[in-house]
Amino acid sequence: MNILAVIPARYQSQRFPGKPLVMLDERPMVQWVYEAAKSCDFFQDAVVATDSDKIADCVKGFGGKVVMTRDDHLTGTDRVAEVAGFYDDMDVVVNVQGDQPFVTPEALEQLVRPYREGERPEMTTLGCPLDMDEDYASPNAVKVLCDRNGHALYFSRSPIPYFRTQGTVPVYHHLGLYAFRHDFLMQYSQLEPTPFETCEGLEQLRVLEYGYAIKVCQTQKAAIEINTPEDLVKAQLFIQQGMTS
């Protein structure tokens, strides 16, 4: 089983321009993510995908591998698919988001475990229990509802489901890590963007809208994502506290 990790890194982020290069404890964020991926012995290779010369120079500077991509990709997964096209010998391709400097090898192993155990899902992702008090109403926390077989029914930034009556149903906090069967990723990249994908701003909805399945693997805790300057402050505090909070 050959598995490739691709880290899409875009310089022109709308909410936080240049965020892959922000410094965390004397290392740029993209280096944190790259080193986390490289620490996983189940990845045959790891590479950063970018259209930015600044990011490419940074990656080369710390000894990482980088592939330059087109600058017209609509999503990170489209960028990952371009790179995957150069790696026909890979069975599975993992999209390790460049805004997750604290992603753990354990979380990445859970993401690819179905493939390593002989399953062949088109795509997997991760979910953890949602903090209903803190995150249920937040558009920055993506919610995912699953069917009885652990496949995603829908992802949304809105508070779903609506609780008309009192009761408890499992609502998961979606974590933006994805693994794809190589052949399916190539197929995904040829699909036109879809209405729900566009209105929610969630690329994984393209898969569901075309009738494909996403297996949601369970993990216990969400890692800090850096999408805004405010998130960077939280990340720096997390490091100061010994990365244990």
Swiss-Prot record:
Record protein name field: 3-deoxy-manno-octulosonate cytidylyltransferase
Family per similarity comment: Belongs to the KdsB family.
Localization per record: Cytoplasm
EC number: 2.7.7.38
Family matches, as HAMAP family: KdsB
Disulfide topology: none
Upper taxonomic lineage: Bacteria, Bacillati, Cyanobacteriota, Cyanophyceae, Acaryochloridales
Function: Activates KDO (a required 8-carbon sugar) for incorporation into bacterial lipopolysaccharide in Gram-negative bacteria.
Keyword Nucleotidyltransferase: yes
InterPro entries, sorted: Cytidylyl_trans, KdsB, Nucleotide-diphossugar_trans
Known catalytic reactions: 3-deoxy-alpha-D-manno-oct-2-ulosonate + CTP = CMP-3-deoxy-beta-D-manno-octulosonate + diphosphate
Uppermost EC category: transferase
Keywords associated with the record: Cytoplasm, Lipopolysaccharide biosynthesis, Nucleotidyltransferase, Transferase
Any Gene Ontology biological process: CMP-keto-3-deoxy-D-manno-octulosonic acid biosynthetic process
GO CC term, one of those recorded: cytosol
Superkingdom of origin: Bacteria
GO terms for MF: 3-deoxy-manno-octulosonate cytidylyltransferase activity
